[in-house]
Design a protein with these regions (language model features):
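A generic structural signal for solvent-exposed, polar alpha-helical segments
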Residues: 4, 22-23, 36, 132, ...
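Single conserved hydrophobic/aromatic residue that forms the stacking wall/gate
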Residues: 1-11
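Subset of Sec-pathway N-terminal targeting signals
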Residues: 166-174
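Short, compositionally biased low-complexity segments enriched in polar/charged residues
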Residues: 12-56
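Long beta-strand-rich cores associated with HINT superfamily self-processing modules
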Residues: 52-59, 64-161
Length: 174
């Protein structure tokens, strides 16, 4: 019930966002977490975490930045919580970025804004398309990230070829 109510609230916000004037001019993309993703996340974390903590990213925005230094300055503002993944997550999977969470108060859902440099966004998009939510070990994403950072992967085609090569050559990654 709590999850259904939360998703309903988020879809109302999506309708508002889609109809609001002037927002098209902002350099933001948004997404609403799919019901499937929300259920998977709920099952993974509940009951160990409160539902509102599990769903802190139902409504998310994505924005690009030239570098992460200005975004990190948001730490100084009271209502912002920063998740700095510029050097990887605690359980690194190759993703890089900064997630900023804003919540007006406990009665409102938080809003997540994901910031990436152009360089990281390109790689993160490929990770999301070909690796994310698959049963691959996180070391697959880390290996691909190293290849990307050493300029061995310069295109989506090369990303896919490297991924296929890694998966074909090693049972470890399956």
């Amino acid at each position: 019930p709590e999850m259904s109510r939360g998703l309903g609230d988020v879809y109302k916000r999506q309708e508002w966002y889609d109809s609001a004037e002037g927002l098209d001019d902002l350099a933001l993309d948004y997404r609403i977490k799919s019901v499937q993703s929300a259920i998977l996340k709920y099952k993974r974390y509940y009951p160990d975490h409160q539902a509102r903590k599990v769903f802190d990213d139902l409504l998310g925005f994505r924005s690009l930045c030239d570098n992460y230094e200005e975004v990190l300055q948001l730490k100084k503002i009271d209502k912002f919580r920063i998740a700095d993944m510029t050097n990887g997550k605690a359980n690194d999977d190759g993703y890089r970025g900064i997630h900023v969470y804003f919540q007006l108060d406990g009665k409102h859902y938080p809003i997540e804004i994901q910031y990436n440099t152009y360089y990281d966004r390109q790689f993160n998009n490929w990770l999301h398309k070909y690796v994310y939510k698959k049963e691959y070990d996180n070391s697959v994403g880390c290996y691909l990230r190293k290849r990307y950072e050493s300029a061995k992967i310069l295109s989506e085609k090369e990303f896919k070829e490297e991924l296929d090569h890694v998966l074909f050559d090693s049972e470890t990654y399956r």
